């Protein structure tokens, strides 16, 4: 079963707290990809604390130029160079010139056969990308349509490849379970106000990692003016995107803990299932 591991290395906003560092999330999938979403100050040490070398990262995806999301990047670049590696960094196009001077490989998308990640524009105060990850998890076959087929053919069909049995060519679509989705999606927003135009472009996702800078003590208009969201905004986004799982992060240092965020989230009947993790918490998400 496809499982994605998320380790929350920093769940805070612009100002760190002793138990809530600046934004950074480590993602590892069942295919072996290791992705760092944002690179807040001190993230290199946090990676080492969970046993991950910077040089082992498949790529780093930063959402925008604000310091709380990128101050950990120079250290990662330097360490990777010492270890003989060259980091791949995904970022908004407005950041490419500055990042290329660090000697990293810069782009705004990355693609392999079963894994894609691309920038989707969000609604912040500067040019900013949310990162949409797509996995090809293969087809789930309808057993009533595959009776009698050899095992090798089933394996190829699950991978999405047609097979030839005698004179007949069978495509995966012919024998697939229509209730099963071949592609699974995770969206990490970074900093954003409510962004209906982005929701329309994306369509739907399985997992949404959305900022919730504010609980309910700041007016929505004030939060949106600053390019941020409230808990209610994040829940609205999850429902607009049909997300089954919502993970709230980027919690302002104005809150001594996340109890108010959790209280607001507890009023919602799933879906989405809402998680408000602490730093160093690991989430295993089944796609």
Swiss-Prot record:
Q: Which GO terms describe its molecular function?
A: 3'-tRNA processing endoribonuclease activity; zinc ion binding
Stated EC number for the protein is 3.1.26.11
Name any cofactors this protein relies on. Answer: Zn(2+)
The signal peptide annotation in the UniProt record is none
User: What HAMAP family would the database entry show?
Assistant: RNase_Z_BN
> Family assignment?
Belongs to the RNase Z family.
Q: What is this protein called?
A: Ribonuclease Z
Q: Which organism is it from?
A: Pyrobaculum aerophilum (strain ATCC 51768 / DSM 7523 / JCM 9630 / CIP 104966 / NBRC 100827 / IM2)
Taxonomy of origin reads: Archaea, Thermoproteota, Thermoprotei, Thermoproteales, Thermoproteaceae
Query: Gene for this protein?
Result: rnz
């Amino acid at each position: 079963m496809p499982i994605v591991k998320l380790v929350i290395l920093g769940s805070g906003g612009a100002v760190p707290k002793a138990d809530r560092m600046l934004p950074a999330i480590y993602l590892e999938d069942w295919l072996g990809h290791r992705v760092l979403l944002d690179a807040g100050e001190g993230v290199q040490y946090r990676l080492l604390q969970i046993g991950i070398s910077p040089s082992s990262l498949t790529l780093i995806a930063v959402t925008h130029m604000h310091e709380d999301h990128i101050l950990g990047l120079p250290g990662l670049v330097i360490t990777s160079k010492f270890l003989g590696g060259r980091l791949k960094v995904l970022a908004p196009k407005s950041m490419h010139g500055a990042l290329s001077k660090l000697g990293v490989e810069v782009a705004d998308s990355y693609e392999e056969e079963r894994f894609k990640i691309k920038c989707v524009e969000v609604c912040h105060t500067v040019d900013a990308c949310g990162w949409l990850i797509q996995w090809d998890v293969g087809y789930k076959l309808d057993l009533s349509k595959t009776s009698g087929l050899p095992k090798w053919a089933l394996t190829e069909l699950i991978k999405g490849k047609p097979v030839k049995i005698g004179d007949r060519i069978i495509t995966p679509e012919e024998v697939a379970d229509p209730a099963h989705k071949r592609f699974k999606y995770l969206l990490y927003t970074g900093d954003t106000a409510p962004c209906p135009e982005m929701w329309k472009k994306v369509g739907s996702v399985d997992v949404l990692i959305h900022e919730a800078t504010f609980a309910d003590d700041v007016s929505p208009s004030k939060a949106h003016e600053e390019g941020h969201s409230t808990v209610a905004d994040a829940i609205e986004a999850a429902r607009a995107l049909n997300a089954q799982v919502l993970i709230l992060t980027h919690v302002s240092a104005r809150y001594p803990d996340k109890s108010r965020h959790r209280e607001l989230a507890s009023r919602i009947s799933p879906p989405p299932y809402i998680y408000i993790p602490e730093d160093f918490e690991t989430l295993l998400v089944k796609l």
